[in-house]
């Protein structure tokens, strides 16, 4: 019996020690450290995306024009001299692919994309590209994620942080 009591006392002792009696301590995070950490992670993601874009351009032998925002474009076939202006309505045929080459959307399945330039209804990179294009141009655009759907994707087929590759033909401008 004595051995049983010692064993029982031993079990209760360790059970008591295993109970958490400490008060929850609040972890204070330095806002500057958090900001620096987020900036570092963002720089890494931007550099990684930039490397992927450069690799894509080199693999496909594209001679692209790069804008200050990160948009890249090449006109594959020159159309008319009629440059697209802000406020005009543009109709275009398109194929939209991921940087890995997977088809996401196309005008064959979705219909032509029609939008007002500068209206904010399409990806900002696509909107920006219109300033460099003419009626009947055929072009390839590389739109980095920050000029496309960014952090959230399109909640359908485009995942977060996706670089988009558009091949477009400007059908009409009004």
Predicted regions located by residue number:
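Bacterial N-terminal signal peptides
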Residues: 7-16
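Short, Lys/Arg-rich N-terminal segment immediately upstream of the first membrane anchor
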Residues: 1-2, 11
């Amino acid at each position: 019996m004595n051995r049983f009591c010692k064993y029982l006392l031993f079990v209760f002792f360790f059970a008591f020690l295993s109970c958490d009696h400490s008060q929850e301590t609040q972890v204070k995070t330095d806002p500057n450290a958090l900001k620096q950490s987020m900036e570092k992670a963002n720089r890494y993601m931007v550099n990684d995306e930039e490397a992927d874009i450069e690799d894509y351009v080199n693999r496909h032998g594209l001679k692209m024009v790069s804008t200050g925002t990160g948009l890249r474009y090449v006109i594959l076939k020159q159309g008319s001299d009629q440059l697209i202006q802000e406020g005009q309505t543009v109709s275009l045929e398109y194929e939209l692919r991921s940087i890995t080459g997977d088809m996401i959307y196309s005008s064959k399945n979705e219909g032509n994309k029609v939008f007002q330039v500068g209206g904010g209804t399409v990806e900002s990179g696509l909107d920006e590209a219109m300033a460099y294009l003419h009626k009947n141009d055929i072009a390839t655009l590389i739109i980095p994620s920050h000029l496309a759907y960014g952090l959230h994707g399109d909640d359908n087929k485009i995942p977060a942080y996706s670089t988009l590759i558009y091949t477009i033909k400007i059908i009409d401008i009004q």
